[in-house]
Amino acid sequence: MALSSDDVVKIARLARLRVSEAERGAVQGQLNGIFDLIEAMRAVDTAGVEPMAHPQDAALRLRADAVTETDRRSAYQAVAPQVENGLYLVPKVIE
């Protein structure tokens, strides 16, 4: 599946990205490369391959559930721009 220049413009608009005329060819090549990789992965015969959650079948070492660090809240909040009642105050980003 090869994308056309018009497809790149449509994808950029849907993703709310500004792609200039000069960048369009490079973006088209990169997207076509991604789709080629996906097609190559789809072509691999995986019949009989057992799904796995992790490539190494090893159990992770667990440490004891014990406190290993001291309380540094006051030191961290001393350098914070704004703190109130032990909480960090941050600017509102969503109206």
Swiss-Prot record:
Organism (species): Laribacter hongkongensis (strain HLHK9)
Species classification: Bacteria, Pseudomonadati, Pseudomonadota, Betaproteobacteria, Neisseriales
Quaternary structure, from the entry: Heterotrimer of A, B and C subunits.
Keywords linked to the UniProt accession: ATP-binding, Ligase, Nucleotide-binding, Protein biosynthesis
EC identifiers of the protein: 6.3.5.-
Catalytic reaction list: L-glutamyl-tRNA(Gln) + L-glutamine + ATP + H2O = L-glutaminyl-tRNA(Gln) + L-glutamate + ADP + phosphate + H(+); L-aspartyl-tRNA(Asn) + L-glutamine + ATP + H2O = L-asparaginyl-tRNA(Asn) + L-glutamate + ADP + phosphate + 2 H(+)
Function, in words: Allows the formation of correctly charged Asn-tRNA(Asn) or Gln-tRNA(Gln) through the transamidation of misacylated Asp-tRNA(Asn) or Glu-tRNA(Gln) in organisms which lack either or both of asparaginyl-tRNA or glutaminyl-tRNA synthetases. The reaction takes place in the presence of glutamine and ATP through an activated phospho-Asp-tRNA(Asn) or phospho-Glu-tRNA(Gln).
Similarity comment text for this entry: Belongs to the GatC family.
UniProt-listed GO biological process terms: glutaminyl-tRNAGln biosynthesis via transamidation; regulation of translational fidelity; translation
Name the UniProt record assigns to this protein: Aspartyl/glutamyl-tRNA(Asn/Gln) amidotransferase subunit C
NCBIfam families, A to Z: gatC
Domain of life assignment: Bacteria
InterPro entries reported in the protein's UniProt record: Asp/Glu-ADT_sf_sub_c, GatC
Alphabetized GO MF terms: asparaginyl-tRNA synthase (glutamine-hydrolyzing) activity; ATP binding; glutaminyl-tRNA synthase (glutamine-hydrolyzing) activity
Keyword Protein biosynthesis found: yes
